Swiss-Prot record:
Coiled coil: none annotated. The record marks D60 as: Reversibly protonated during proton transport. Its main location: membrane. The chain crosses the membrane at residues 9-29, 54-74. The gene is atpE. This is ATP synthase subunit c. GO terms for cellular component: plasma membrane; proton-transporting ATP synthase complex; proton-transporting two-sector ATPase complex, proton-transporting domain. It is a multi-pass membrane protein. F(1)F(0) ATP synthase produces ATP from ADP in the presence of a proton or sodium gradient. F-type ATPases consist of two structural domains, F(1) containing the extramembraneous catalytic core and F(0) containing the membrane proton channel, linked together by a central stalk and a peripheral stalk. During catalysis, ATP synthesis in the catalytic domain of F(1) is coupled via a rotary mechanism of the central stalk subunits to proton translocation. Key component of the F(0) channel; it plays a direct role in translocation across the membrane. A homomeric c-ring of between 10-14 subunits forms the central stalk rotor element with the F(1) delta and epsilon subunits. Pfam families: ATP-synt_C.
Length: 84
């Protein structure tokens, strides 16, 4: 039983780490491409900024979904019922 709980905690930690890493890489690429495109065509900066914020919200959703799944596995572990 303790092995299942330990493996679940480790798995949830890895899930959160990869979600945070993916979100950070996504924000870095998004910011770099936004600055590059704004420097190339300054008249489109306001339109690009709106689209950038929409994509940034979707990138944040990845981390929030990972938090939700991790909390599900930690507090309402579906694998403990398989042991009985």
């Amino acid at each position: 039983m303790e092995t299942v709980i330990t493996a679940t905690i480790i798995g949830a930690s890895i899930l959160l780490a990869f979600a945070a890493l993916g979100t950070a890489i996504g924000f870095a690429i998004l910011g770099g491409k936004f600055l590059e495109s704004s420097a190339r065509q300054p008249e489109l900066a306001s339109s690009l900024q709106t689209k950038m914020f929409i994509v940034a919200g979707l990138l944040d959703a990845i981390a929030m979904i990972a938090v939700g799944i991790s909390l599900l596995f930690i507090f309402a572990n579906p694998f403990i019922g398989l042991l009985h």
